[in-house]
Every structure is written in C-alpha cells, then in structure tokens.
From Swiss-Prot:
It comes from the Bacteria. Keywords: Cell cycle, Cell division, Chaperone, Cytoplasm, Isomerase, Rotamase. Its EC number is 5.2.1.8. This is Trigger factor. The keyword Isomerase applies. It is found in: Cytoplasm. Residues 174-261 form the PPIase FKBP-type domain. GO terms for biological process: 'de novo' cotranslational protein folding; cell division; chaperone-mediated protein folding; protein transport; protein unfolding. GO terms for molecular function: peptidyl-prolyl cis-trans isomerase activity; protein folding chaperone; ribosome binding. It comes from Synechococcus sp. (strain CC9902). Consists of 3 domains; the N-terminus binds the ribosome, the middle domain has PPIase activity, while the C-terminus has intrinsic chaperone activity on its own. Its main location: cytoplasm. It catalyses: [protein]-peptidylproline (omega=180) = [protein]-peptidylproline (omega=0).
Length: 447
C-alpha cells in the first residue's frame, strides 16, 4: 500500500516532541497480517513439514494468533511510520514511541479493520530570541601578571635541580621529607582512608597536604617522631572528612633538598630553546601576554553568549540532550585513554549512566549556547562570504604538513564554523554593552 492511503495528523507536544496520528486502512492491515504468516512460514521448523510448506491452519495452531498478530503489527507500525514521515515531509530526530503502548494496540488490532495509532518522536526545536541588540553583558578581566615570569623560571629551576641529602639540620620549608605517617580522626579515633603511608616523599613547599601537616613537619630531625594535629578544610573533596580534626603520627625517615642551577645563559639553554636569560624572559613575557589576551577574549565571548542565552526561548528535545551527554562522556573516555588507562574496564555501565546524568547540565548549556548563536545568525541574517572562506582555507592548509591526511569537506566545515563564530562574536560585541567586572579572588584550597 502506498503512503497516499494513510490519514496522518500531527500535534506539537512539550520538549520539542511531535505526536503523529496515523490511520491505516483495513486492506493494508490485512496485507501486513498475510505477509507475517508467509514470513513465519518460511522461518519456522515443524516436524513432518518442509520449511515454507507448513499449512496455514497448522501454523496458526502452532504459533497462536497473538504471535502472528504481533509480528504483523510490528511491521505495520514500522512501515506506516516511514510512509507517514515521507508523506508529511517530517524530520524526526529520534525513534518513535507508541503513545498507547504496544500491548494495548495489539488487543485492538484486527486484520481487515482500520487501525489508528499515535507515535511520538523528538523533532529539531525552533529557537527564538526575545532580543538581539542592546544586551548587557559582563566579563571578568584578565590582567597580565609580570611576577609569573619569575614563578615559571623558579619552577623550571626546581625541575632541573639536583636532589641531595640534608645533614646536620632540621627540616625547613622547601625541603623534601621522606615520611611515614598514620592519620586518625580526633572525634572517634577511626583511621583516615588514604591517610597513611610507610614511606612517602612530601614537598614541604607546595601546600598539597591539609592545613597543619607541613607546618608540623618543619623543624623535625631525621629519625624523630611526633603527633601533629590538623583539620580538614570545609571544602575538602571527601565529604565525610570535611571540617573534621585529625591527628597524624609522623616519622621523619629521611630529608633531602634541592640544589638549584644558577640563573645564567646555560640554564636558559637547558630549560628552553632560548640562548640567553634575557631571551628566555622575553619569550615567557610574550607567552603570558598572549595567554592573558586569549583568556580575556574568551571571557568576553562567554559573557556575550551568556547574555544572549538569557534571551533564548527553546524547548530542548531529550534526544539532543542525550546525544550531547554521550559526546561529553566520550570526550572524557578519550582523555583517559590518552593517559594510558584501560577505558573498557574502567567505564562500566553503571559509571557511564552516572557520567551521563552528571554531564546533563553541561550538555543542556552547550545546546542552549549553540541554539542561541544559530538563532542570532538567522535573525540578523549573518552569513559567510565565500572569498573569506577560501582565504582562510588557504591559510590553514599552509600550516598543515605535506603528508597530513585531511578530509577536505570536514576541513572546510571546520573553517566555516570558526569564521561564523568570529562573525557572531564581532556582531554581538558591536551591538551589546560589555562591562568589565573585577576578577574573583583565587581560592587557595588545600587538598
């Protein structure tokens, strides 16, 4: 039967769902039932009968009318759905669900009688912006910090330092202490999970331990043991430890320190590709300035898009949220794989479900940002110029190695996406009020 014989009506539902009600004529129902009998006859094996030669009455008796009807109905729903979306030029983005459920429909299905059922599926939403111009946006300023040059140089000195044993003095800030320790909670005396070690190198300068621990070690001598009182921060990652007082029995087993290289041209060559300290400082300054500029631009763009999203009206379909959540989980898995982790054993079904659920807010936010920008491009008729695309493509190809294998279509699409993003951000900056806000103070959380 052709799709023209179907009666189809549609109704919009919340969350960008579309209800499609299909009425299938009786003759098509009969044809589906007869085809189900033929199909089952070809596949079933019954003693005394060749495959495909089982009499109809025997087949119905052996399989039962319900199984035959169920097979016919499944195929009927599938074919009717495909014909209906083609007939009505519909573009669903998910598989359909029966509104009434399959079992209920099966009870009312009688070959030869007209059959009506409703299927629901997600469709692409239609995003709208309440306003595009005169938006008020805020961004956090990023200031180039010249002192970071010295910090980066000192970090390089530490990495290139020679570790030597300490003799004849107590532990000082900046030393490397080899410790044995055992931690217990002060309130109930229970042992702290992960709070013990037989021999562990602890840097007495980087503040990675909880407050009070390193301070208690400073001043100790090799071979000395003592009890140090500490308290876990209120924002400590492990919830059951937050704010609790603890006692650590600590033994200083060995003590080492770093002999730092001189800050000379030889160090510059060893630590970088620069020949002199002056060149090294100049290079680091430029890198930090470029980084500050990139972060400043990113903050400005984030502020503008946030203001735009506040103007967005869109009903996100579940199919898109699930797909975006999967993308985020796959990105996480790829990062773990790059670190050499066994992703297949690590990512159990339970973990994947938890990650999918936890990534949902970020997935929804990503979709809203994307739809807001798409709606802006449509509302303000922002389009790309072919010559700009070609020029950018040539620039990108120049930076690619000669043996790089790149899909031309994917490369062109990536270039178009970048250019459109630049145009949209430029338009927003021109047509919005962007206000700088003071940077938030950096938290100094110790873990």
């Amino acid at each position: 039967m052709s799709a023209a014989t179907l009666k189809v009506s549609t109704e919009s539902r919340p969350s960008s769902r579309l209800a499609v009600t299909v009425t299938v004529p009786g003759e098509r129902c009969t044809a589906s039932y007869e085809e189900a009998i033929k199909s089952l006859s070809r596949s079933i094996n019954l003693p005394g009968f060749r495959k495909g030669k089982v009499p109809r009455s025997v087949l119905v008796q052996q399989l039962g009318g319900v199984r035959i009807k169920a097979t016919a109905l499944e195929k009927l729903i599938d074919s009717a759905w495909r014909d209906a979306i083609k007939q009505e030029s519909l573009e669903p983005i998910s598989q359909p669900d029966l509104s009434s459920g399959f079992d209920g429909l099966l009870e009312s299905f009688n070959p030869g009688d007209e059959l009506t059922f409703t299927l629901e599926a997600d469709v692409a939403p239609t995003p709208k912006l309440k306003s595009t111009k005169g938006l008020k946006a805020e961004y956090e300023a990023v200031v180039y910090d010249a002192s970071r040059v010295d910090s980066m140089i000192e970090d390089s000195r530490k990495q290139l330092a020679t570790v030597v044993p300490v003799e004849g003095r107590a532990a000082e800030k900046g030393d490397i202490a080899v410790l044995g320790f055992k931690g217990t909670y002060s309130d109930d005396g229970s042992e702290i999970e992960g709070g013990s070690a037989d021999s562990m190198d602890v840097d007495l300068d980087n503040g990675r331990m909880i407050p009070g621990f390193i301070e208690g070690v400073i001043g100790m001598k090799v071979g000395e043991s003592k009890s140090v009182d500490c308290q876990f921060p209120d924002d400590y990652p492990k919830e059951d430890a937050r704010g609790r007082k603890a006692a650590f029995a600590i033994e200083l087993k060995d003590l080492k320190t770093r002999e730092l290289p001189e800050l000379d041209d030889a160090f510059a060559k060893q630590a970088s590709e620069q020949d002199t300290m002056a060149d090294l400082r100049k290079d680091l300054e430029q890198r930090l300035k470029d980084d500050a500029e990139r972060r400043q631009t990113s903050n400005r763009n984030d502020g503008l898009v946030k203001a735009l999203v506040e103007q967005l009206e869109v009903d996100l379909p579940e199919a898109l949220i699930q797909q975006e959540s999967r993308n985020l989980v796959e990105q996480t898995a790829a990062q773990f794989a790059q670190q050499g982790m066994d992703v297949k054993s690590l990512f159990t079904p339970d973990l994947i479900r938890n990650l999918m659920q936890n990534s949902r807010p970020e997935a929804e936010e990503r979709l809203r940002r994307s739809f807001a920008l798409t709606a802006l491009a449509e509302a303000e008729d922002i389009k790309l110029d072919d010559s700009a695309i070609d020029t950018k493509l040539k620039e990108v190809k120049k930076d690619l190695s000669a043996d790089a294998k790149v899909d031309p279509e994917r490369l062109r699409q990536a270039v178009m996406d970048d250019l459109m993003q630049e145009q949209l951000m430029s338009w927003l900056e021109t047509n919005s009020t962007l206000t700088e806000k003071a940077p938030e103070p950096e938290s100094d959380t110790k873990s």
